[in-house]
Design a protein with these regions (language model features):
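Internal alpha-solenoid helical repeat scaffolds
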Residues: 1-174, 182, 291
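Amphipathic alpha-helical segments of tetratricopeptide repeats
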Residues: 2-10, 42-49, 79-87, 117-128, ...
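Linker/hinge segments immediately adjacent to helix-turn-helix/homeobox DNA-binding domains
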Residues: 304, 308-314, 340-398, 413, ...
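Helix-turn-helix DNA-binding segment
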Residues: 313, 337, 379, 385-440, ...
Length: 450
């Protein structure tokens, strides 16, 4: 494309030049480079008739460039204007898809669903398969965010089928990200791994494909409570972030993943340094869900530093930011982290109430992985004790939680991350467990629990 632009003469052949510029627009979109996209779109619009296919497509995608470049309000205004000019036909599908994409990233979730569903429906009216795939991929993310996970999975299946018959692979990682995340949260590790393989099989160098593939892998690792692995997977995103939509609050939910993993991996100074610029940018944009996600990571950090009052403020501010938004998964996530932090600070009764709230949401979502983690937290808190087997006689709730996880094969470090305590504390409990149960090793404990 670089050579094509170098040899075309815009003055003598503006139509061809507009077509080349339009190809650069699409290239910039999947490189997640907003400023470049806007620049090429403006060139295309300057060369093409505003009502020509190249002109309309450039205008329809230009708003996505504004969004990725840090101008979400301008992007929304651009689509409002464009939707009044392009109301019918295949080109209208591009406009409504782009509008839904922007609406979702900007927390306008209900309108995003309406727009994206309209774009999908337009497929039967002569719409583009490529645009339909983008709409399906982002619609699946909408369904995930609001807790409609069965519909999200169904939407992914629809996208998979269309990708297979069309041969268009660019949206496959975006589709498989949703599939992998839901499968991991539901404890279907085989399906999660299969989704990641499907994404990896088509992922090349384009950021729009690399980013969701890495997010899928990282969110599986987080569901496994392997925070060191989560951090390692997410680190490449930090390296590729400058100049891309990764820097935009709410676009890709990776900063809270990284910050949370840093805190739970004991890298507190690194977590603070990482959070600050993302918090500043989210405040500047006024992005509620991004601030809420960063806020729960900040709350984790305050808790790890022993400042429970600051931690409480951060978590409560996050929940307030989410109030009125239909983001059920994010709400459960904040409550779970809040409850863990309260329990670590010795606020068992308060922790019990908050974790119970998280558990109710996770249960309604079918997020069995986190329901089980909530149950372990509640058991460790000691306020909801249940009768165990004769092998467990004499174990405290915290010892029982440690014994269960160790018997499953987790290392002390992994148990510590799961229960939000230090590895030294895990070893202390493990020594007591061995003495009480009359075993001498992890393998003997596992055998006793079979």
């Amino acid at each position: 494309m670089t050579r094509a632009w170098a040899i075309v003469n815009p003055e003598r052949d503006p139509d061809t030049a507009a077509l080349v510029a339009q190809r650069h627009v699409l290239h910039s979109l999947i490189r997640c480079r907003g400023d470049e996209l806007v620049s090429w779109a403006d060139r295309a619009l300057g060369l093409a008739d505003s009502e020509s296919p190249a002109g309309i497509e450039s205008a329809a995608i230009r708003g996505l460039g504004l969004l990725a470049a840090g101008h979400p309000k301008a992007a929304a205004v651009a689509y409002d204007d464009l939707s009044t000019r392009v109301e019918h036909g295949a080109q209208a599908q591009r406009v409504v898809m782009g509008r839904g994409w922007v609406q979702f990233i900007c927390d306008d979730v209900h309108n995003a669903r309406t727009s994206l569903e309209s774009a999908v429906a337009a497929a039967g009216l002569g719409g583009s398969r490529r645009i339909t795939l983008w709409a399906l991929a982002w619609l699946a993310r909408v369904h995930f965010a609001v807790g409609e996970w069965d519909r999200a999975v169904s939407t992914v299946e629809q996208g998979r089928a269309l990708a297979a018959v069309s041969g268009i692979a660019v949206t496959t990682p975006l589709l498989e990200w949703t599939a992998a995340q839901i499968a991991a949260l539901r404890g279907d590790w085989t399906a999660a791994a299969s989704a990641v393989r499907a994404a990896t099989a088509v992922t090349g160098d384009y950021e729009m494909m690399v980013i969701p593939t890495l997010l899928a892998r990282a969110q599986i690792a987080e569901a496994e409570a392997d925070y060191a692995k989560t951090r390692r997977i997410v680190e490449p995103l930090a390296r590729m972030a400058n100049g891309t939509s990764l820097m935009e609050p709410g676009y890709w939910p990776w900063p809270d993943l990284q910050a949370n993993a840093l805190v739970l991996d004991g890298q507190l100074d690194a977590a603070d340094g990482f959070l600050q610029p993302h918090e500043e940018r989210a405040r500047a944009r006024g992005h509620r869900s991004a601030l809420a996600r960063l806020g729960y990571a900040r709350g984790r950090l305050h808790g790890a530093l022993g400042d429970i009052h600051a931690a409480r403020r951060s978590f409560e501010e996050s929940l307030e930011l989410l109030s009125g938004l239909p983001l059920r998964y994010d709400t459960a996530r904040v409550n779970f982290a809040f409850g863990q932090t309260l329990r670590r600070a010795g606020k068992r009764r308060q922790a019990d109430a908050v974790i119970s709230t998280a558990r109710e949401i996770y249960l309604s979502l079918g997020a069995h992985t986190y329901v089980a983690r909530c149950d372990r937290e509640l058991k460790a808190g000691g306020l909801h004790q249940t009768r165990g087997s004769r092998d467990d006689v004499g174990l405290t709730p915290q010892e029982e939680s440690v014994a269960t996880l160790v018997a499953q094969g987790l290392s002390n470090r992994e148990v510590a991350a799961e229960l939000y305590v230090s590895p030294k504390t895990v070893q202390y409990y493990l020594t007591r467990i061995y003495a009480k149960l009359g075993v001498r090793s992890r393998s003997e404990l596992a055998a006793l629990r079979r």
